[in-house]
């Protein structure tokens, strides 16, 4: 199995990147926490989880081993597959997720698209003890990056659609936000997610 990839970023979007490793382009699914931490171009290393199904092999990449550990913990819960685990990490930062699981915050967990009350309760029940053993001291909040407003809004729409939100709902929330010309993708995405989770 592939555990680590190092290569050039050939393409970057909120839910995946194409990583060029010695002339071979790997499509690697990523959560927003990893997206925020990646440069627009250059050489990067990603911790990889390889998901093998009968019809596909998918790679999930994480900037830190802690993110990968959270991803694998989430996969250990019945009813949580790789896409849902990635979506959870896209909606809730690792430190917040550890806190939500530790405190049994069902409301925060069930606000993620695809997670109902029963799944949120199962997450808390099965992961509460395991999450307490993870070292969260390496969690770093990334610096926001600036981009043109039109591109920014389209990237936010794309990211939210990939998370399972419906386009009319996303457009309505974005219409109510005022990102301004100096807004970052991270900032607008966080504002939109907060509005959608209410």
Swiss-Prot record:
Region: Domain II; residue ranges are 64-142
Q: What is this protein called?
A: Holliday junction branch migration complex subunit RuvA
Signal sequence bounds: none
In terms of SMART domains, this protein maps to: HhH1
Keyword terms:
Cytoplasm, DNA damage, DNA recombination, DNA repair, DNA-binding
Subunit field text:
Homotetramer. Forms an RuvA(8)-RuvB(12)-Holliday junction (HJ) complex. HJ DNA is sandwiched between 2 RuvA tetramers; dsDNA enters through RuvA and exits via RuvB. An RuvB hexamer assembles on each DNA strand where it exits the tetramer. Each RuvB hexamer is contacted by two RuvA subunits (via domain III) on 2 adjacent RuvB subunits; this complex drives branch migration. In the full resolvosome a probable DNA-RuvA(4)-RuvB(12)-RuvC(2) complex forms which resolves the HJ.
Mind telling me which GO cellular component terms the entry cites? cytoplasm; Holliday junction helicase complex; Holliday junction resolvase complex
Q: Provide the gene name from the record.
A: ruvA
Q: Does the keyword DNA repair apply?
A: yes
Q: Where is this region: Flexible linker?
A: 143-153
Q: Which GO terms describe its molecular function?
A: ATP binding; four-way junction DNA binding; four-way junction helicase activity
Keyword match Endoplasmic reticulum: no
């Amino acid at each position: 199995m592939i555990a680590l990839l190092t290569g050039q970023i050939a393409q970057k979007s909120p839910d995946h990147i194409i990583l060029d490793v010695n002339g071979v382009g790997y499509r690697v699914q990523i959560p927003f926490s990893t997206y925020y931490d990646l440069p627009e171009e250059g050489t990067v290393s990603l911790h990889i989880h390889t998901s093998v199904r009968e019809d596909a092999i998918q790679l999930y990449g994480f900037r830190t081993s802690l993110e990968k550990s959270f991803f694998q913990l989430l996969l250990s819960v019945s009813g949580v597959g790789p896409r849902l685990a990635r979506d959870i990490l896209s909606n809730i930062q690792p430190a917040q997720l550890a806190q939500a699981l530790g405190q049994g915050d069902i409301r925060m967990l069930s606000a993620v698209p695809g997670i109902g009350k029963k799944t949120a309760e199962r997450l808390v029940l099965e992961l509460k003890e395991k999450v307490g053993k993870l070292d969260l001291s390496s969690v770093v909040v990334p610096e926001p990056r600036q981009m043109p407003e039109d591109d920014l809004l389209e990237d936010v729409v794309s990211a939210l659609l990939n998370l399972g939100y419906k386009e009319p709902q996303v457009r309505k929330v974005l219409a109510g936000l005022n990102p301004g010309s100096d807004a970052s993708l991270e900032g607008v995405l966080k504002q939109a997610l907060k509005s959608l989770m209410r």
